[in-house]
Amino acid sequence: MKKIFFIVLSIMTVLNAEEWAGRSGGFLRMGISARSIAMGGGFTAELDYSFPQFHNPAWTAFLTNRQLGSSYSNLSFDRRLAATSFATHLPPTAGIGIAWVNAGVTNIQGRYSTGMKSSMMQTGENAIMFTFAQRIFPWLAIGSTVKILRYDLPITESDQLTGSGIGFDIGILMKTKKFFTYGITIQDISSNYQWDTGNVYAEGRIYKENFPTIYRVGTRFNRKELTLVGDIGVIT
């Protein structure tokens, strides 16, 4: 009976993950650095070197050195994912950061209404992020990220749909005197693409695609050469 229960639970978990993977803004949930992806993305309380503001914006308030990072992933089915990030401390107790994430699909064969081939096209999703964080106490910081979002979707050689919007992340980070760090983040608050199809389709309209909001709680244990991280997250 227990075996059947775990099999059913596993299937339901996979199906639920597939549903959320197809929601808007998936490129922001794929992971940027090899280290964070290899560790399951559980970096709410862990510093992702070179990309400190992606998982928890409050981390920028604890930076002591400038952080610059860039990555590019050539994915299957002609997909791409690229990111560039810069973050630095802002004396005496703050930190700032800016980042750009780009994703899309290349080598899309366009066709005319007759079926003949036209030009090659590509899609593009972009997020520009501005981060500010402040240490309230030496052991506690709060941070926020503003995201400017844009999605370019080609229809024909001359027609293109563009969706745009704004979203927010907030994060809290607490460091203990010993070996533990705790973090809380809420990602993609009010993030969305707003589309206007009136210029392309005769009966077009304005509508919004909302990103799922992610709530995370995480912890890190770091002592000498041992680092343990853990995250619990809920997607709504």
What is each PLM-predicted segment?
Residues 1-4, 138:
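Positively charged n-region of N-terminal signal peptides that target proteins for export
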Residues 4-13:
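Sec-dependent N-terminal signal peptides
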Residues 12-15, 34, 60-63:
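N-terminal processing/targeting junctions
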Residues 18-46, 65-68, 73, 80-236:
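Outer-membrane beta-barrel porins/channels
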Residues 51-62:
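N-terminal periplasmic accessory domains that precede
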